UniProtKB/Swiss-Prot annotation:
One of the record's GO molecular function terms: ATP hydrolysis activity
Keywords noted in UniProt: ATP-binding, Cell inner membrane, Cell membrane, Membrane, Nucleotide-binding, Translocase, Transport
Organism: Shigella flexneri
Stated name of the protein: Aliphatic sulfonates import ATP-binding protein SsuB
Assembly mode: The complex is composed of two ATP-binding proteins (SsuB), two transmembrane proteins (SsuC) and a solute-binding protein (SsuA).
Gene: ssuB
Length: 255
């Protein structure tokens, strides 16, 4: 693990990144810079390239063209600093909660696993089986499993999409709190625009493989649900998502 990034997160730089599947162009010469420790949400219609972007950053796929860098280093060279959460928590049902958190680790890892579970609010469920947990609790285990590695980059692919509304809000608060404590870089893919503006520093809209909106969320934390400014930003993003025409021009809003 690269300890130099533990307190500041992984900076990301994508230069002219494209991803093709035969004749289907999913990402089209995408350029993106994300400073270390920034919380970025990515929204857009299905098939626009959101999850493909996360898969490239996670090393699950390779770009057809372009460079994916952590600062000046190819991201693939420091993949151990990256962790990813999915909508399905992907817990092994035959292993206890604490064993799922420590999956793949060697040596004296149980104390670290207990600390990670405590940070995720599940310290009292360490010895239980995944089948005994609710959907939200399973995602807390998945979050603890990511935290134990002290990642520089946390990738979130719709991890809250299957949760009920109250549990979803609780998980949003937990993820933001842990991000503030640990300083890792976060990329969240979500179809929920309200979730994006509530959690992120910055919201990107990907359309037809390109970034068509790059919006700074200029709201102090903690953010109050139902605030006028949150509603205005949500409406701005939704208006862009729902519009009929597609412009190639990048729209930026700062401050």
């Amino acid at each position: 693990m690269n300890t130099a990034r533990l307190n500041q997160g992984t900076p990301l730089l994508l230069n002219a990144v494209s991803k093709h599947y035969a004749e289907n162009i999913v990402l089209n010469q995408l350029d993106l810079h994300i400073p270390a420790g920034q919380f970025v949400a990515v929204v857009g219609r299905s098939g626009g390239g959101k999850s493909t972007l996360l898969h490239l950053l996670a090393g699950l796929e390779t770009p057809t063209a372009g460079d994916v860098l952590a600062g000046t280093t190819p991201l693939a060279e420091i993949q151990d600093d990256t962790r990813m959460m999915f909508q399905d928590a992907r817990l092994l049902p035959w292993k206890s909660v604490i064993d799922n958190v420590g999956l793949g680790l060697k040596g004296q890892w149980r104390d670290a696993a207990r600390r990670a579970l405590a940070a995720a609010g599940l310290e009292n469920r360490a010895g239980e089986w995944p089948a005994a947990l609710s959907g939200g609790q399973k995602q807390r285990v998945a979050l603890a499993r990511a935290l134990i590695h002290r990642p520089g980059l946390l990738l979130l692919d719709e991890p809250l999409g299957a949760l009920d509304a109250l549990t979803r809000l609780e998980m949003q608060d937990l993820i933001v709190s842990l991000w503030q404590q640990h300083g890792f870089t976060v990329l969240l893919v979500t179809h929920d625009v309200s979730e994006a503006v509530a959690m992120a520093d910055r919201v990107l809209l990907i359309e037809e493989g390109k970034i068509s909106l790059d919006l700074t969320v200029d709201i102090p934390r903690p953010r109050r649900l139902g605030s006028v400014r949150l509603a205005e930003l949500e409406a701005e993003v939704l208006q862009r998502v729902m519009r009929r025409g597609h412009s190639e021009q990048l729209i930026r809003r700062h401050g």
